Amino acid sequence: MKELLSKFENKRPELVFEWKDPYTDAEGWVVINSLRGGAAGGGTRMRVGLDKREVESLAKTMEVKFTVAGPAIGGAKSGINFDPKDPRKKEVLKRWFAAVSPMLKSYYGTGGDLNVDEIHEVIPITEENGVWHPQEGVFNGHFKPNDSQKINRIGQLQRGVSKILDNANYSPDLSKNYVVADMITGYGVAASIAHYYQIWGGELAGKRVLVQGWGNVGSAAAYYLAQKGAKIVGIIDRVGGLIQTEGFSFEQIRELFIQKNGNELNAPELLNYETVNAEFWNTPADIFIPCAGSRMITEAQLTQLIASGVSVISSGANVPFADSEIFFGPIAEKADASLALIPDFIANCGMARVFAYLMSSDLEQLDDAAIFEDASQTIFTALEKTYQNNQQSRGIAKTAFEIALKQLV
């Protein structure tokens, strides 16, 4: 696995596009790791301090993710080094998409990512540049549909990703108009844990869960885990957190989901960050879901989690451990050798899978249950393949990487 991994990590990307904004200090990169299957896909992010290496490592991460989620295409990523809070953000994005739109028409598909919104920024700005849909390049390069299929499937994509949930099994509150894109990644993280117990043995109901991050992914994963009978015992995010060793009720978690303030936990009894950070990592628990930023979990925190009884980690965040390696550094390796580590490219592939599902065939209707169950089944299949190669609860991530990399190297 190590050999395959270093081969994949060190292989030069097929295409790197570099951009410098003439009017601000913004700069950006598109990295297309490969045009496997004729196209590549990966979102567009913006943050201060982003560099080409970050974009390249995320493009490689996407390529691995597509081996699970489909379609069988290359990985890509776009990144802009600029402050997303700057009032000139929209102008910067307009000039950026004007520059990259020829790729988006031909062989590259993008979407929203960190600090870049799919619905309010990516779709309208790419449309202004003559791109039918941000995924048009994947249609043209990979699926090669005829015109009527293309129109139909672009319609499916547009409606599917922003479909308002009307099934109470998937929506915390039908009156709030939550959409597929709000919930699907967190749903996949929860499903990956349920499937882990289903395949390797054990029972999710009653298990104690620690959640890091209360954005779309963490809050939705916690909601669906609580719905399945798990007990959320601790939540930490950048503003503070909550700890309840006997576990919050499903109703309390539902309320915390509904009351969140954008991507932040919002509760009257919120503990400050210092207090919660001192307690969180030592709270007795069975499951930990890192759903905050990348490369945050230190070795000391991992050691505390293991000592607290954590035996399953499902990676809601991409590359959650504070390793410098693109995929699998010493901290990730220690986690994988000590407990059941479900890797990011399986656990958080929900959104990528929805894209593949909506693009690959002409559907009779768009149905919440069909979309969510398809994502769940995709995650189940990936874990089942892993189990066929390794029945131990240790080394799951290593085995899963091996299966993915054999398709790519």
Predicted regions and their residues:
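Short, Gly/Pro- and small/polar-rich lid/capping loops
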Residues: 1-20
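Rossmann-like adenosine-cofactor binding region
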Residues: 240-341
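Adenosine-phosphate binding glycine-rich loop
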Residues: 306-409
